[in-house]
Amino acid sequence: MEGTNNTTGWTHFDSTSNRTSKSFDEEVKLSYQVVTSFLLGALILCSIFGNACVVAAIALERSLQNVANYLIGSLAVTDLMVSVLVLPMAALYQVLNRWTLGQIPCDIFISLDMLCCTSSILHLCVIALDRYWAITEPIDYMKKRTPRRAAVLISVTWLVGFSISIPPMLIMRSQPSSMAEDRANSKQCKITQDPWYTIYSTFGAFYIPLTLMLVLYGRIFKAARFRIRRTVRKTEKKKVSDTCLALSPAMFHRKTPGDAHGKSWKRSVEPRPLPNVNGAVKHAGEGESLDIIEVQSNSRCNLPLPNTPGTVPLFENRHEKATETKRKIALARERKTVKTLGIIMGTFILCWLPFFIVALVMPFCQESCFMPHWLKDVINWLGYSNSLLNPIIYAYFNKDFQSAFKKIIKCHFCRA
């Protein structure tokens, strides 16, 4: 989004020879143009390829054709429009360090820039909203999660984008002051610096969606953590509860040392239920030995030996390790959720927050605020790079998309 003047400041060195100074400046400018053209060209091509692969994967792979992926596909189409319609003109403006296409193409460029970038940001907000509904209202929302609903959400993103991008072209440009400014700065192509429009556009395109995304993903994390922990608790409760046999020493009778089977205890058992005990006990007849085949328990029965007062331990806790393992798995899932949400929000904020801070602040302090032109350019292209990163975050990390991409690369769909 061209919120600032896209010009690059170069340092000129004084020299006794004007020719030497001019030659040095041309060499620096040529090297800058070559390096910049290569970097921006690579960014544009990678962005086009990545988003085109996402669109092709959803169109060709039936397993990917669901509402959640339709939203991701629409995001890819929007970022593809940014890559094809906006970035080439922005790159030309950046490399030449001046606008050479005229005023009407400048107006079209600014409108497309704001429309596509705003729609891309709002798509991220819609995807967050869809995920929030899916995880907080899984049963009810599954009935409402239809392609028609997805189409409505996508339409809203474009309508909001139009409401933000059209005013600069149709309203602001018709003002006499704006026309006079355009004639005075024919080599520049920048958005209007009107303070009221700046507040309206920056809050509508970024700050409100950012706030909504932070709230939604915060609640998604809380809901996901609650469901993970509830699943672990349910798994523990579903374990079959058996009986931990509490035995009193007075109920036992030791056989004489001469008995063939050595020491054993006479069967006199009082069953007492304890939580989470799984086991199999072979009950012997009167005068026979009592054999314990296998016992598993989630809570250790710390029972004393027969020659001490109290009850006698017959069972070992075999499920403690399993329970601890499940807790570790649950913790790993929570960490993965935090990592995923952190990547989504971190990338979005890193790419767009610097740009919108500059876009909001600079119109109010044009004379007192100073920022190097190179820093403005870096911030500007950092925002554009979000169109390259979106397909990586939302699609390439998805295993279903990965298999579809492999088919596309191997031209599996072509043979089919």
Curated annotation (Swiss-Prot):
The chain crosses the membrane at residues 36-56, 71-95, 105-129, 150-171, 196-218, 341-364, 373-397. It is a multi-pass membrane protein. G-protein coupled receptor for 5-hydroxytryptamine (serotonin). Also functions as a receptor for various drugs and psychoactive substances. Ligand binding causes a conformation change that triggers signaling via guanine nucleotide-binding proteins (G proteins) and modulates the activity of downstream effectors, such as adenylate cyclase. Belongs to the G-protein coupled receptor 1 family. 5-hydroxytryptamine receptor subfamily. One of its GO terms (biological process) is positive regulation of MAPK cascade. A motif (NPxxY motif) lies at residues 390-394. One of its GO terms (cellular component) is plasma membrane. The lineage of its organism: Eukaryota, Metazoa, Chordata, Craniata, Vertebrata. PROSITE patterns: G_PROTEIN_RECEP_F1_1, G_PROTEIN_RECEP_F1_2. Gene3D superfamilies: Rhodopsin 7-helix transmembrane proteins. The gene is htr1a-B. This is 5-hydroxytryptamine receptor 1A-beta. InterPro entries: 5HT1A_rcpt (IPR000610), 5HT_rcpt (IPR002231), GPCR_Rhodpsn (IPR000276), GPCR_Rhodpsn_7TM (IPR017452). Keywords: Behavior, Cell membrane, Disulfide bond, G-protein coupled receptor, Glycoprotein, Membrane, Receptor, Transducer, Transmembrane, Transmembrane helix. Glycans are attached at N5, N6, N18. Disulfide bonds join C106-C189. The keyword Cytoplasm does not apply. A motif (DRY motif) lies at residues 130-132.
